[in-house]
């Protein structure tokens, strides 16, 4: 159950980052203020809930194991950036993502 909490904390953290990115996207001047407030408000909500879940994780998992698992954020953000904003990702970046996943598997298997 705690590992599921860690995954949700990671996903909410990523959602907060993606909302911040969306807040920076261009919109008409007449809608800009509402757009920014909406997306930054969602970002704060996601990041706040992620922090609460993260505290629950830290109560049950050594920080030396739990913290590296947040590297999943790099993986989620890369995938979302490609899907949502069609951002280019170099082969070198994908290689880095693969190393991150490998590291998470290695660290996760030590528990």
From Swiss-Prot:
Residue ranges, Periplasmic side: 57-60, 109-111
Membrane topology of this protein: Multi-pass membrane protein
GO BP, one annotated term: lipopolysaccharide biosynthetic process
Domain EamA residue range list: 40-109
TM region(s), chain numbering: 36-56, 61-81, 88-108
Pfam families: EamA (PF00892)
Pathway membership, UniProt: Bacterial outer membrane biogenesis; lipopolysaccharide biosynthesis
GO MF annotations, alphabetized: carbohydrate derivative transmembrane transporter activity
Organism domain of life: Bacteria
Disulfide bonds: none
Family: Belongs to the ArnE family.
Name of the protein in question: Probable 4-amino-4-deoxy-L-arabinose-phosphoundecaprenol flippase subunit ArnE
Gene source species: Escherichia coli O157:H7
């Amino acid at each position: 159950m705690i590992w599921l909490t860690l995954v949700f904390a990671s996903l909410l953290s990523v959602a907060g980052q993606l909302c911040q990115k969306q807040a920076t996207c261009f919109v008409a001047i007449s809608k800009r203020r509402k757009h920014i407030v909406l997306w930054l408000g969602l970002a704060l909500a996601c990041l706040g809930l992620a922090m609460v879940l993260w505290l629950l994780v830290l109560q049950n998992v050594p920080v030396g194991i739990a913290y590296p698992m947040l590297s999943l954020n790099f993986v989620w953000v890369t995938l979302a950036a490609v899907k949502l904003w069609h951002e280019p990702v170099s082969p070198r970046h994908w290689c880095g993502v693969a190393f991150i996943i490998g590291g998470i598997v290695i660290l996760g298997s030590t528990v």
